[in-house]
Amino acid sequence: MAPFQKAISIDTAIADVRDGSVLMFGGFGGVGSPPSLIEAILDSGVTDLTVICNDAGFPDIGIGPLIVNQRVKTLIASHIGSNPVAGKQMTEGTLEVQFSPQGTLAERIRAGGAGLGGILTDVGIDNQMVCEKKDIVTVAGKRYLIEEALTADFAFINAYIADEFGNLTYDKTARNMNPLMAMAARRTFAEAERIVPMGEISEEMIVTPGVFVEGVVRSEGVKWKWAWE
């Protein structure tokens, strides 16, 4: 692929995802999720996935369909309350859920992208469930949990505008964890509403530099109905 021509097909973007892959998905309750890439991964039939995402989406929104169709073996997220299927699978033991407070989750992903081994945080230091099986250190007289950094085989993220080099801009709060995930995965693919020639995005507007992005696909749009509609 030419370095300045990263626009690819959706099928090409997901071609190397295999059973057992570790995937990051941007999105907050589906907002900022890459709908076309999620649908393609679902249609591909891959399973036993480890998914890192802010939340479990809704049954028909965001990463929800991957969970509903039992493609996810392990979910690392800050909450799952909006998707009752995820809660049911967790209590039945068919889905492993690793909860991480939202801010901690973001920083663990950021650490992964920065090449750090983890972060120190006092969030949950007095909660036995949060502290279980985690190391605690004392720095300047204060106790902290050591939270491991998070990385992935692939990050599938959503952008508003991409150029042909993979430089990305985002639409307001749809940005959420997408820029962090772009840096924390071995391979990153972005789904964008628009793909423009290189140079059309002002350098002041670029949030994710194209050096972090392997390929961009044009979004086919949201096919689900939002919860508030």
Curated annotation (Swiss-Prot):
InterPro entries with a match to the protein in the record: 3-oxoacid_CoA-transf_A (IPR012792), CoA_trans_fam_I (IPR004165), CoA_transf_BS (IPR004163), NagB/RpiA_transferase-like (IPR037171)
Record GO terms (molecular function): CoA-transferase activity
Its EC number(s): 2.8.3.-
Keywords per UniProt: Transferase
Main EC class the enzyme belongs to: transferase
Keyword Ribosomal protein applies: no
SUPFAM superfamilies, per database record: NagB/RpiA/CoA transferase-like
Pfam families linked to this entry: CoA_trans
Binding site for CoA: 26-32
NCBIfam families for this protein: pcaI_scoA_fam (TIGR02429)
Assembly description: Heterodimer of a subunit alpha and a subunit beta.
Protein name: Probable coenzyme A transferase subunit alpha
Native source species: Bacillus subtilis (strain 168)
Name of the gene encoding the protein in the UniProt record: yodS
